UniProtKB/Swiss-Prot annotation:
This is Guanine nucleotide-binding protein subunit beta. GO terms for cellular component: Cul4-RING E3 ubiquitin ligase complex; cytoplasm; endoplasmic reticulum; heterotrimeric G-protein complex; nucleus; plasma membrane. Induction: Induced locally by Alternaria brassicicola but systemically by Fusarium oxysporum. SUPFAM superfamilies: WD40 repeat-like (SSF50978). Belongs to the WD repeat G protein beta family. GO terms for molecular function: GTPase activity. It holds the Pfam family WD40_Gbeta. It comes from Arabidopsis thaliana (Mouse-ear cress). GO terms for biological process: abscisic acid-activated signaling pathway; defense response to fungus; endoplasmic reticulum unfolded protein response; fruit development; G protein-coupled receptor signaling pathway; jasmonic acid mediated signaling pathway; lateral root development; plant organ morphogenesis.
Amino acid sequence: MSVSELKERHAVATETVNNLRDQLRQRRLQLLDTDVARYSAAQGRTRVSFGATDLVCCRTLQGHTGKVYSLDWTPERNRIVSASQDGRLIVWNALTSQKTHAIKLPCAWVMTCAFSPNGQSVACGGLDSVCSIFSLSSTADKDGTVPVSRMLTGHRGYVSCCQYVPNEDAHLITSSGDQTCILWDVTTGLKTSVFGGEFQSGHTADVLSVSISGSNPNWFISGSCDSTARLWDTRAASRAVRTFHGHEGDVNTVKFFPDGYRFGTGSDDGTCRLYDIRTGHQLQVYQPHGDGENGPVTSIAFSVSGRLLFAGYASNNTCYVWDTLLGEVVLDLGLQQDSHRNRISCLGLSADGSALCTGSWDSNLKIWAFGGHRRVI
């Protein structure tokens, strides 16, 4: 078969796939007679009152010399760990902006970091395909090198995300470019379960993000370059419980809704979406006006009530605050005076929801506090 014939067959196959995708999209729209925004408007719900003075930048954390890729809060809300292209993990006191630890990593190409529930250890992973655990009680040498207390080896691709199981310092879940997620026993360093891989219900491309349910720690969501998100139960690793479609690009970030029965996603297609894990339905699409000008969604987080969705975007150095009920942007942090000078790569809310931290390719982190008399939403 000639090259021209192969190209022609490829073009025909691509057109067929696109047509089938359009048919699936139209069929889903027919099955769903409404979405959250239309239903809320019909019920007379009004837009949440939220303005530029309600979320203000109170601190800028400076110390990294490279792009910030990941961050995480401790459960007690006053410490943040960040991972950067400069090859260091920095633990910050969020109240004073002081650095309490600056850990030099064995591999500079770090992509993710996470605090243990007790706040005594941090985990990180990246292009070395290893998830490394550091004890914050260990003594660093003069170069800032802290001995690795545990190395979780087993992935055959980069480690894209790691998260401790809530209230369990001994268990952690990682996602990887090898198309799998792994549940680890941190105490022994051994795999407990592998999700995906040889199983047909697993992802068919790199897994980029995971989020564990706060209401049921046996459930977690994974997002992948195959444009899907999948629900898993750690008690039955052999197959995904449910697969969620809708995105037209890599699913870069996933986050459980506060009630534990819904979750949000952010994608390279520039949209955020809200799904219900019980019905498998897509509830809402959050898409900014002006197709594609904001670029991919890099990171998301929900307020403690779920009424607000914070979404970072790769373009325009912006973070939108969405009203999840009405599907409207109520605040653009990119327009604030103290906004980032480069793309927002990661963000997260403190445990009590009183502060938002954003990390950026401008090497800085910023802490945004709910200003004035406003209560946490």
